[in-house]
Each structure stands twice: as structure tokens, then as C-alpha cells.
Amino acid sequence: MKPKSNKQFPSQKSAENRVYLKFTSHLNETEFRNRCKENEYWYHSYYFDNGFVQRGDYDIGQDFEGYQFPSELSGMSILDIGTGSGWFATYFEQQGADVTVTDVRGYCDFDLFGRDRYPNVSTEKPAPERKLADGREIYYSPVSQGFWVMKDILGLKAQYYNARAYDICPELFGDKKFDLVFMGSLLMHLRDPIGALMAAHSVCKHMLIATTYMLPDHSPLNEPIMKMRENAGDGISWWIPTQACIAQWLLAAGFKTFNIDNHVRLTTDSPYKHPITEKSTGVSQTQQLIHAYV
């Protein structure tokens, strides 16, 4: 998809295959930028078809084709687990999908490596940020606040639920299951990736798409092993598996068939400092692409 306007904006990068999101708001550029300033941390970059840009850690639109989503998303029910700033949820909805997203209440729910190293992360329940029409109290961390800013700006209808990856179950969504379950760059940040995949499987009617780090193919015999990323330095990274290990994760979670032979590029755009570690978060990387089926 190409931008509708030929006007060039200084922060807009040129990319032949870039995916531009639709700007469905009445806000002018100044109003848009002022609303975006309400959020201090953007995990995803937003490049719109009218030239408006909000830059974040990662520019998904530049490498979107690598995820190999179904070509037709209209009418599908999609669950985006760990939506972050909500780029994928926005794209899914603009393609006609029925979108549900989840994210944690705050950093108190993150799987932190050495939690006592981060005294600023409270273990207490945070104050709710808002209430929904059905009375549910909603909480969000700086990572997911961007979703709410864009939801308000664009008028998105995506349903939001507070939940850790391990808490996903049909009962959370009124016994609903989803045609497609998406877990983008999440598994490496979890202590128990198998448990999270089991939870995802419980609400998956057809297909799971996920990405994660993987040990090189030349790892010893490509045995089903995983390495702890104790030296990652970001406080939220845990495991790097071999390809054989990813296969065992998926089988253990209940998926019957899968393809884990492809990769996706995650490109840094405008790195922010992580709100927990205060280190720059954006590092371009190649991740293993997982397509799994129930």
C-alpha cells in the first residue's frame, strides 16, 4: 500500500513495500502530534497514508510482508496477545477483522529477570486507567498506553482485556475462540513459553502466528535445547531455543502441524529508553517465524 499523498515528510522513510495504516481521524497534524505526546514510550512506529508519522522503537510496516499473514483477513476473528502500542491490532481491524487484544496491567505483571534489581517496579495492583462501558476496570503499562492513544485517535473498535499470556483462556472472552492468534516478539520475554503457547492453543480455532529468537542452525545436533539469556541486559529476556526446541514447544502445547523454517526482520526506527532498565530498547533483529495449526 502506498501513501495517498505525494507530499514528503522529513521523518517518513522510503520503502517500496511499506505498509501504511489508514488515518481515519479528523485531527490535523498538529492535533495528532499533541495527542501522541501524551504517551512517553512508543514500542511501534505508526506511518499513515496521509503522511502523518509517530515513530517508535520498531517499524513493523517496513517489514510486514515477512510475517506472511493470510492475504484475506476480512471477517476473521483475531486475538493479539501482548498488543503493545497496537500496530498489528490496528492493521488487522483496518483489513476488516474482528480484533481482540490483551496486555498486562503494568510492569508488576512482567516476567522480570531478577525482579529485585528493579525496585521501581511495584508488585502492588496499580490504579485503573479507565473503565469500559461494561464496567471493567482497565490497566495499562507504558508499553500498551500507545494502543489507547491510537484507539482514541482512530476510533478503533478492538476489544481490550488485561491478561498475562498465561491467563489466556476461552472463559476470559466469554468462551470465544479465534481464527488467528498472534504473539509478536513475546515468547522470548516469558519464563514459561510452553505455558503461554498452551494458553494460546486453548483459544485458537485454526492458526497461531508468533515470532521469537532462535539459536543458530549449527547449534549442537540442533537438539531440542534452549539457552537462558542471562546476559541480555534488558531484564525481560529469558530463552533462546533451537529450531528443534521450538517444535517441541508447539507439540507440547497441542499444535498438530507447524512451519518454523522462515524468518522475519524487526527493524529499529527511533529507539526509546526502556521504562524499566532505562536502556535503549530498539535493536534491529531477525526472528524465527512460527506458523502453527490446531
Language-model segments: residues:
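Conserved alpha-helix/loop element of class I SAM-dependent methyltransferases that forms part
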Residues: 53-75
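Short, conserved loop/helix-junction motifs that constitute active-site signature segments
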Residues: 73, 92, 200-203
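Conserved class I S-adenosyl-L-methionine
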Residues: 76-84, 100
